[in-house]
């Protein structure tokens, strides 16, 4: 998929990333793919455990992402992306974002600012995706950073 891929999870951080991705897609006149991942469960010690896909939960995640897109579009000043596609998948966020970005021009992610022990145990999508992505990755910092 060419264009821009943005990962969303319903957080304020992902909403900021979505806003930035919409602006980038509009400026560049490229399609925007909004990807939400119905996440596999993480085990107690940080090991991933994959459970069977639940189509109902994945569809709920897609609808939530669509609502987030609609909200951001409603408040967007200026140009809008030529097209916006919302996709929901089941899996591990880092892997799914890297796969979605294989043919993309850019990936946009929000930053939660996790650090220390949390990052060591769980890793961070915004720190792992740039290391393995096949395209440029923009990390949108938290609003209160400064």
Write out the residue ranges for each language-model feature.
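Small/aliphatic-rich secondary-structure junction motif
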Residues: 2-51, 84
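Hydrophobic structural packing positions in well-ordered secondary structure
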Residues: 4, 21, 32, 97, ...
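Short secondary-structure boundary segments
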Residues: 36, 111-112, 141-142
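Short, hinge-like loop/turn segments at secondary-structure boundaries
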Residues: 49-53, 104-105
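A short acidic, glycine-rich active-site loop
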Residues: 52-67
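Glycine-rich, Arg-bearing micro-motifs that act as flexible, cationic patches
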Residues: 106-131, 146
